[in-house]
Amino acid sequence: MGLKINRPRRGSMGVYPRKRAADIVPRVRTWPEVNLGKPALLGFAAYKAGMLHAVVVDDRPTSPLYGKEVVKAVTVLDAPPLYVWGFRLYTLDPTNGYKRAVAEVWASELPKFLHRVLTLPEKLDVDKQLKKVEEFRDVAVDVRALVATQPHLSGIGKKTPELLEIPIGGVPSVDERINFAISLLGKTVSPKDVFTPGQLVDVIAVTKGKGYQGVIKRFGVTILPRWHKHRKGHRRTGTIGPQAPAVMFTQPRPGQMGFHQRTEYNKRLLKIGENGAEITPKSGFPHYGVVKGPYILIQGSVPGARKRLVVLRHPVRPPRKAPPAAEPQVVWVSSQTL
């Protein structure tokens, strides 16, 4: 029996292919079924402004610091209200069991900034669209709101909005969701309408792009000794596989690093504020600007660069021991970025 060597493979195969994300706007593939007692959107979109540190009272009963003030790193998300410009009705396709859109309703009067991304019809017959909704109301299985961000209300300095499709949930009755979607047409939704301070959320965003990188930085491969017998290189793998098969994709190779869509589960939402001046540094957030209106404080870090769109949703795999449901007591928030 020789020495047992534990050498895990370098990098995760669960995130292949390691290529650039198709779109900088995150694509959410899974939405949870939550019971909120009232219909509501299951997600929200905001812009990453930067990071600060805050003094928060530890409210975990099993913590040795329970009831004491602790310092935590927090991410600031600029969260202007989302504009609801329409909704879609889905039913199950009898041939394959997949969801299929059968009706779509737009708001009667759309704001000017939507002309940058939507080609609006000259005559919009909303009553005709609503009749189609009533036609499929009994067989509908899902209702999703069509929302647009309002970057002109943020500190980014751009005007073109992003379009997203966010499901409406919170109640099991699809009929209630349809009525709620109709009531939202042409209105805005703020973060407080979707989340409550203290709850857990999933964060979905496209990470920072690093460009073309080698195996040392991309996979954490061990640097080979720098002596004469390693004359073919040091910042490389010892082998790229056998003679056959010709290419083993499981072997670490150089290539694109970063700009991948990633999901981080169960981040705690510490605070939802209305006045961004409370937490904006005197000179503004570096490489971002000034948070003017509503904002969200997330405990810990969030994927992506500053100004990047981040999608928050209700947790799809909440832990068995969830944190206290009460709103955390944020004693102080710094005015200096990390």
Swiss-Prot record:
One of its GO terms (molecular function) is RNA binding. GO terms for biological process: translation. Gene3D superfamilies: 3.30.1430.10, Ribosomal protein L3, domain 3, Translation factors. One of its GO terms (cellular component) is cytosolic large ribosomal subunit. PROSITE patterns: RIBOSOMAL_L3 (PS00474). SUPFAM superfamilies: Translation proteins. Keywords: Ribonucleoprotein, Ribosomal protein, RNA-binding, rRNA-binding. Residues 230-258 are annotated as: Disordered. Part of the 50S ribosomal subunit. Forms a cluster with proteins L14 and L24e. PANTHER family: 60S RIBOSOMAL PROTEIN L3-RELATED, LARGE RIBOSOMAL SUBUNIT PROTEIN UL3. One of the primary rRNA binding proteins, it binds directly near the 3'-end of the 23S rRNA, where it nucleates assembly of the 50S subunit. This is Large ribosomal subunit protein uL3. The gene is rpl3.
